[in-house]
Structures are given as C-alpha cells and as structure tokens.
C-alpha cells in the first residue's frame, strides 16, 4: 500500500492526462460527425420546405433513423463493455503486482502511464493524418506524372513507373483507370512510396497506365452539369487519344462506381473502335443485392443537393459520405471509432504505420460533391435490378444497355470482388454474369479482404495483382495486372 501512496502523484497525473486525451479524442470524432449531420439537416430542411415528403415517406425515414440509433447504441455498448472489462483485468493485475512488490509485472503507476500515453496517441493521431498528406495518393505536380489530355470534365494523367529500371513499354495495351466520382481518385494511388498503389502496380510492369481525374467541381461549371452521356462521349475522346498514341485499343479499369460507368460506356457501343477490354474492381453491377444501401429509404433528390453560388445544383459529398457512414454505423459511430483506435495503438505499440494514417486521410479528406445527374444514375442502380433479359436499369443516349452485348462487341471482362465486402457484396458485383451467354467473356475473381483491400494491399501474398494465386475454393486465379499483361501478349500475336 505504501508503494501505491508513494506513486499517487504520478498515478493522478496519468489519470488526468488519460481523461483529457479521451475527451479530446471523443470530442474530435463527435465534432466530425456532427458537422456532416448539421449539413444534412440544413439540406433536409430546405428540401422539406420546397418539396416536402409524404407522410408515408416521413414515417419510413423516422423508422430508419430509429434502426440506425439502435444499431449504434448496441455497437457502442458491446464495444465499451469489452474495453472496460479488459481495462479492469489489467488494472487489477497491476494493483496486485504493486501490493506484492512484483518487479517483473507492471505496477499501477506504470499501467496508468502506459494508458495515458496510448490515449494521447489516439488524441494526437490527426497529426499523423496531416503528415501523410505528401505521401498519400497521386502527387500530380511531381515528375512522376504527365498530363496527357484534357476534356471539359476530365484530366488524363499518365502514371509513370517508380520501380528502378522499368520503362513504359509501347508493345503493351494502354489502360485508363477510372475512379468513382464520390470517393476521389487518390485511393487508386494510396501510398506509392510504400509499394501500396494499385495504379503503380500496372505502371511498374511497363504498362502504359493513365488515370482519369474529374476536374474541381466547385470551380468548373462543365463538371457540375456532367451527365452519363457526357461521361461516355468524353471517355471516348480519351480512348481515341491513347489509341492514336499507342496503336492499340484501350483497357478501361474502373473501381466501384467507376467500374459501373465503364461498363455502361462500353455497352453503349460508343467505344467499340477504341476499347476492347474491361476490368472492374468491386463494382456494384446490381445495387439491389447490396442490402446495406438498397435498404435505405428512398427520397427525392432535393434531399441530397446543394445549390452552388452560380445556381447549379450538385449532390452534396458530405451528405453522401454520411449516408455511407450510416450503412456501417456499428463501426463508424464516434465512441466505437475511438475505442478501435485505442485497440490499434495498443496492438502496434503506438506505431500504427502509414497505412492507417492514409486510410483515415482518404475517409476524412476525400469527400467531394458529385454532378447531380451522375448521382441520380447511381441512385437508380441501387433501386432497380437488372431486367430479366439483361438490361441495366439506366440508359445512354436514350438506348438500352444489355450486358449480353459484351460478347457481340468483342470485349473481355475481368471482374473482381472482395469476399468480405459488406458494401458491394459478391452477389452485387457478379449479378450480370447469369445473363452473359458466352462463358469466355467474363473472368470472375474473388479477392480476400474488404471493399478497398485490393487498392491498399495490391501485393498481398495471398492474392498478388501481378501474379497467380489459388482461392479458397481451390481454383487458380490471376491478378488484374497479370490479366492485362496476358491480354497484351495475346493481342500482339494476332
């Protein structure tokens, strides 16, 4: 007991440090979420005044909100119970170590000091998020990238190899990476310096690799007014540019919403002369199979729009991001996020590394507004399924888009999905396959992990993007980089 009394000033100081750091961390998470919620409330009030919901719609919203609140509360209670139990166990052990003067174990003062250090690391983690800025994603202002072309809506940058001794090979098919409008482009670059970049995994094999970047929607009126037809027309222009430069048809490589848009553009027949290969990563081909999103109440688009100073309306990125957080509210509510960060700091001995900081930066800093017509198109794909004859629920240039036309258009489709993806579930990503009669058109590949695993860990030993691997079902698969190289080799023989 004398040992505890002797260390009491240190224990009290550590307790105060712990409490202050916990308060800072929880306040930061609450403030970040509340900011998005206040923006959502402001938009909803304006929409309710101009175009009010029906009583039935209002009741559905209230019921959905109740379900979200219940899910968040349940997750918080479960997480907090586990955390408190672990803390009591460790504190009790430290207490008895102190009483018995056990020098081999941690005493109360050491336990409290360690907990305070961990909590301060959590509270100060935003510093790591800011510090990773110059390493995260594409740094288009550097010599590692070249502006290849520009349209009203898009910038096309070439991604140059970072691997020593590798040069761009003109004998390989060129590729355009198409990110989703909503999540931004930088997740495709992630951490090039750490060899964790999906884009550079292609470039470092000598593949002529390009990335399509949406211009700043806040300053570019053409972007604000972009619709799916515009996207297709301008994508054709980009492909024509690369075909003229490299002498081969282009591979479109789309991620998430970007993959769906690439599929639409190809099925329209507009790209027949310039594109013959499609790669999609975790693309929501039939959003009705994603219960997390399709199960959300349907509201008219006034409830997601923001009016810019020039009078144009766009889909608010903060509101759409908040909707995605609600989908995963059991992991995304403020208390659970703080407790998860505590567990991470403990597991990594307060050194979680650059990957975690980069992921947080992507989630917090990459929210952008969307062209309203693009948002409407995406919304429709989660509300209406592919028809019984294979037609997508959306059209281009007023014409239907049938997935079975891929074979007629001579397009090969490499389609991958994430086994543990709860946003774009495997059935959601593979829904079109049953309608495609030619079994040589689609190559369907399962990857371990969640929604962005292939982007943040492209060289995972279990499923390297540039090699072959065996899935849990015993089937041998190849990664998308290997697929692109093989397709290039096949094309060269013709």
Short names for language-model regions:
Residues 131-135, 139-218:
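Short, surface-exposed "cap/lid" segments of acyl-processing enzymes
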Residues 431-494:
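Catalytic active-site module of serine/aspartate enzymes centered on a nucleophile-bearing elbow/loop
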Residues 381-405:
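Active-site nucleophile elbow and catalytic-triad environment of alpha/beta-hydrolase enzymes
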Residues 253-262:
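Gly/Ala-rich beta-loop-alpha elbow adjacent to hydrolase catalytic centers
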Residues 217-222, 232-250, 263:
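Conserved acidic catalytic loop of the alpha/beta-hydrolase fold
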Residues 409, 415-417, 421:
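Short beta-strand/loop motif that positions the catalytic acidic residue
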Residues 2, 10-111, 247-248, 261-376:
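Alpha/beta-hydrolase-fold enzymes
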Residues 422-428:
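Conserved alpha/beta-hydrolase "acid-adjacent" motif
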């Amino acid at each position: 007991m004398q040992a505890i009394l002797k260390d009491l000033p240190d224990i009290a100081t550590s307790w105060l440090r712990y409490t202050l750091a916990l308060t800072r961390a929880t306040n930061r998470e609450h403030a970040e979420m509340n900011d998005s919620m206040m923006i959502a409330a402001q938009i909803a009030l304006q929409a309710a005044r101009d175009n009010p919901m029906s009583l039935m719609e209002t009741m559905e919203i209230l019921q959905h909100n109740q379900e979200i609140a219940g899910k968040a509360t349940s997750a918080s209670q479960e997480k907090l119970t586990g955390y408190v139990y672990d803390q009591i166990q460790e504190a009790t052990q430290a207490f008895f170590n102190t009483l018995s003067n056990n020098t081999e174990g941690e005493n109360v003062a050491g336990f409290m000091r360690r907990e305070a250090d961990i909590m301060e690391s959590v509270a100060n983690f935003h510093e790591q998020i800011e510090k990773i800025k110059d390493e995260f994603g594409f740094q288009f202002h550097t010599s590692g990238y070249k502006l290849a072309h520009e349209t009203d809506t898009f910038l096309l940058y070439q991604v140059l190899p970072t691997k020593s001794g590798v040069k761009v090979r003109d004998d390989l098919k060129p590729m355009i990476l198409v990110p989703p409008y909503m999540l931004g482009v930088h997740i495709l670059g992630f951490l090039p310096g750490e060899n964790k970049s999906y884009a550079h995994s292609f470039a470092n094999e000598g593949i002529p690799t390009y990335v399509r970047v949406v211009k700043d929607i806040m300053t570019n009126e053409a972007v604000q007014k972009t619709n799916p037809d515009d996207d297709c027309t301008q994508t054709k222009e980009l492909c024509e540019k690369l075909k003229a430069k490299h002498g081969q048809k282009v591979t479109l490589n789309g991620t998430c919403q970007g993959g769906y848009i690439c599929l639409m553009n190809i099925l329209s027949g507009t790209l027949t002369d310039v594109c013959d290969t499609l790669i999609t990563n975790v693309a929501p081909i039939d959003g009705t199979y994603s219960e997390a999103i399709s199960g959300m109440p349907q509201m008219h688009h006034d409830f997601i729009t923001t009016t810019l100073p020039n009078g144009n309306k766009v889909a608010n990125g903060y509101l759409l991001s908040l909707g995605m957080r609600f989908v995963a509210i059991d992991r995304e509510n403020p208390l659970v996020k703080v407790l998860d960060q505590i567990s991470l700091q403990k597991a990594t001995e307060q050194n979680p590394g650059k990957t975690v900081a980069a992921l947080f930066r992507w989630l917090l800093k990459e929210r952008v507004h969307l062209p309203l017509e693009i948002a409407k198109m995406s919304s429709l794909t989660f509300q209406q399924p592919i028809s019984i004859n294979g037609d997508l629920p959306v059209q281009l240039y007023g014409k239907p888009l049938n997935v079975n036309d891929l074979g007629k258009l001579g397009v090969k489709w490499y389609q991958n999905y994430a086994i543990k993806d709860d946003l774009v579930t495997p059935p959601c990503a593979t829904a079109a396959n049953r309608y495609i009669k030619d079994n040589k058109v689609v190559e369907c590949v399962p990857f371990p992990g969640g929604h962005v695993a292939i982007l943040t860990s492209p060289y995972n030993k279990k499923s390297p993007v540039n090699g072959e691997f065996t899935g849990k079902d015993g089937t041998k698969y190849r990664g998308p980089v290997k697929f692109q190289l093989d397709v290039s080799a096949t094309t060269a023989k013709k």
